[in-house]
Amino acid sequence: MAEAAAAPISPWTMAATIQAMERKIESQAARLLSLEGRTGMAEKKLADCEKTAVEFSNQLEGKWAVLGTLLQEYGLLQRRLENVENLLRNRNFWILRLPPGSKGEVPKEWGKLEDWQKELYKHVMRGNYETLVSLDYAISKPEVLSQIEQGKEPCTWRRTGPKVPEVPVDPSPGSGAPVPAPDLLMQIKQEGELQLQEQQALGVEAWAAGQPDIGEEPWGLSQLDSGAGDISTDATSGVHSNFSTTIPPTSWQADLPPHHPSSACSDGTLKLNTAASTEADVKIVIKTEVQEEEVVATPVHPTDLEAHGTLFAPGQATRFFPSPVQEGAWESQGSSFPSQDPVLGLREPTRPERDIGELSPAIAQEEAPAGDWLFGGVRWGWNFRCKPPVGLNPRTVPEGLPFSSPDNGEAILDPSQAPRPFNDPCKYPGRTKGFGHKPGLKKHPAAPPGGRPFTCATCGKSFQLQVSLSAHQRSCGLSDGAATGAASTTTGGGGGGSGGGGGSSGGGSSARDSSALRCGECGRCFTRPAHLIRHRMLHTGERPFPCTECEKRFTERSKLIDHYRTHTGVRPFTCTVCGKSFIRKDHLRKHQRNHPAVAKAPAHGQPLPPLPAPPDPFKSPAAKGPMASTDLVTDWTCGLSVLGPSDGGGDL
């Protein structure tokens, strides 16, 4: 054992161990380097986050500062609003107009203005003589007027009404200043209207006409009307209509209106009696005007309108504006018209029937818009699905109107030839079945005397026509022979002989048709080859009509044509009432249901508007020009079906 322990270690083993230790140390060093890199990146991200947090805090401080400014401005605006409400409540403030100089210089009269007044004037002049009405610069004492004008102490302003405590101009939120209620503002407006009527009654406009122009004096003082709560603007002069007049200082004492009494002061200045306002002190508002000359708005009286021939004479207005009684008579008469004044050439129809023959309308109303006559049946009640009476032009005769004869002017009424209402279909005599047009009525045969003589032997259904029974037998898988035999046994001997003969000949043809027009997938039978071809596309998924503009494909040529119009912009179906165009005809019909069924008759003696020209299928309304040759080739190609060129029937 001791010999084994004392055996020396091989140098190769030592070298391998040392190499393994070195590799392990290198891996640990690489791992340490990666950890140091990740630590540096984390520190950098942390620094970026701290920087972003600082920026957010700065932005938040800025937002808080802006919010504080907004709150301060809101409080200031609220105080201004309370100030304006107090002024409107007191109804006793003045508007001072500062006329600017000719070249922007300060007039000599303004040498003794205060500093804030000069600063205000500079701001006004900087605005290129724009109109400024500032309710912010409200002064509590009116003596500034005389101080600015004459440069001396003004006289005391007196009132005849009782004194009340002064209302502060800029009340604080805790001052408890009264705020007018909405009903008080309405009362102010009503009082202003009453005073305006009193001014018109007393002839105030005559007094205002004798006033000199505002340009004669450097100062213009105008008192706002007592209805300050309802300030309106004259559209012609741009001046508030509540400004009653302009009073120069030299003519204040002599030319005041009757409802504003005046008396002389001790120093020759103006003293106004402000008995109409007893709530608070007088307020002053600084204002500059753009106009050098002000036109006083004079109310218009009905007498002036009559002098210029603007109003209707007694009885004239009723000829142009019918009374409600006449309007009610119009509604009660339905499509007929009421009696009118002979001046307009209108008369009342005596009976609801209409004239027949070559007639002219006897009622002349306004001209109907272009296009109302093509679909006139919807608007006049004509049934264009039925043939109109002989000699009657449906494009010229609206329903419910009388017509005069060209010979003697008498009405020719024939109830038997009256046009049928729009919703009344053509009916066969003695039958209840209705048809939309006269050709359909002619094609419908008379009812057989036996009712439904053709009965199916399989299911027992009865039919009036043998053609219907044959089609039904194909769906049941039988031939026409069985159907004919069943029909012969039902109709009798004579009918049986003819039915039997027809059955032998028709049985073979129906068998051939049944085998030729039967779907091999589901066994369904069809009466036309086109229907079978269209049905087979449902099983095969074939869409033989591709669009050259996009990737869509269609099973029918008509659907491809409708889709292709979305690319070309062609809308061939145009509404004759409003002019809107549509791609499909059913869209046009749906749109025409929204139009009212009332139209206007053409004027008497005027020709009818021409029919609208048919739309050009080779011209796009969006492009306003002819279509390209490639589009024409595409349209011709799209018109080819699997059976060849389409015959216009639209089956495929």
Curated annotation (Swiss-Prot):
The keyword Zinc applies. One of its GO terms (biological process) is negative regulation of DNA-templated transcription. Its main location: cytoplasm. Gene3D superfamilies: 6.10.140.140, Classic Zinc Finger. Residues 607-618 have a biased composition (Pro residues). Residues 96-167 form the KRAB domain. One of its GO terms (molecular function) is zinc ion binding. Residues 491-509 have a biased composition (Gly residues). Residues 16-92 form a coiled coil. It is found in: Cytoplasm; Nucleus. The keyword Coiled coil applies. GO terms for cellular component: cytoplasm; cytosol; nucleoplasm. Ubiquitinated by PRKN. 'Lys-48'-linked polyubiquitination by PRKN leads to degradation by the proteasome and may play a key role in regulation of neuron death. Widely expressed. In brain, it is heterogeneously distributed throughout the brain and localizes to neurons, including substantia nigra pars compacta dopamine-containing neurons. Weakly expressed in cerebellum and midbrain (at protein level). Belongs to the krueppel C2H2-type zinc-finger protein family. Interacts (via C2H2-type zinc fingers) with PRKN. Interacts with TRIM28. This is Zinc finger protein 746.
